[in-house]
Design a protein with these regions (language model features):
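Conserved loop->alpha-helix
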Residues: 42-259
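Short hydrophobic targeting helices and cationic amphipathic motifs
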Residues: 7-10, 28, 40
Length: 259
């Protein structure tokens, strides 16, 4: 075999591997979507889209209960319905025309930013999506994966870059141009490295949500793309504290292809 033949074979092989990766990714995505659909149908869990409907105001937090002033999200809402508060799915326990309360477990307060909220703080609110609702963002379960810390913000024309430091467990599932929910807001990741990621916030998002009201050092709730989490599980890659190498992902792919 000549060197040219070897090079050609190598290119063909790489093209075939690329096609196999795409086919495998499609297969995993379909499986993930089916699992997600089954989960929400069987458990009757609420599902959100990351499109914030309004900004509410904290009235009180304490004794395992949170009270929030709101308006739009209470339209058509009944006791027992789900509302995402800064990305955390809570169940409405009492309500009036312009406010509602929800019970919050101590563990939820500890693992999310809800525990640091105080009277007068703004929060992002979204009702669970109706079965015939329009899907504007991405699938958000309301069960956050952890929190991040805003490390810096930078103005860029009419947009604002927001940089967020997060744990390796969360960063391991973040990809550029992928989706992530930050305080319940569906956003696209523009940059990511080993310690932080960044999103670009347009004026409309800044106006309709609380994100640009945050300052450096503030804590935000983070939920990775649920499809990515299902794909990772289907591939058998544990979301360990360290990043998973591309070589390991390739090995998983080839093992699956060999059957």
């Amino acid at each position: 075999m000549t060197g040219c033949d070897s090079l050609t074979d190598s290119k063909v092989w790489m093209e075939e591997v690329g096609k196999a990766r795409m086919a495998f990714a499609l297969f995993l995505t379909i499986q993930a979507l089916e699992n997600i659909r089954s989960f929400f149908v069987l458990t009757e869990e609420g599902v959100f889209t990351g499109i914030v409907e309004e900004k509410g105001t904290i009235l009180s937090v304490g004794n395992g209960r949170i009270a929030i002033q709101a308006g739009k999200v209470l339209e058509g809402t009944k006791l027992g319905d789900s509302i995402a508060v800064n990305g955390v799915c809570l169940t409405v326990t009492t309500m009036t025309k312009n406010q509602f309360t929800a019970d919050v477990m101590p563990e939820t307060l500890k693992r999310s930013s809800l525990g640091s909220l105080k009277k007068g703080d703004g929060v992002n609110l979204e009702r669970a999506m109706a079965a015939d609702g329009r899907f504007g963002g991405h699938i958000v379960s309301g069960h956050i994966d952890g929190t991040g810390i805003i490390s810096k913000t930078e103005n860029d024309g009419n947009a604002v870059w927001v940089y967020i430091k997060a744990s390796p467990v969360i960063l391991n599932l973040i990809i550029e141009k992928g989706s992530i929910a930050i305080d319940g807001i569906s956003l696209t990741v523009a940059k990511v490295n080993d310690v932080e990621f960044a999103v670009s916030v347009i004026p409309h998002t800044g106006k309709e949500t609380t994100l640009l009201e945050k300052k450096t050092g503030d804590i935000v709730n983070l939920e990775n793309d649920v499809i990515g989490k299902y794909v990772q599980k289907l591939m058998g890659i544990k979301n360990a504290a360290g990043s998973v190498s591309q070589a390991e992902r390739d090995n998983k792919l080839m093992d699956w292809l060999r059957g």
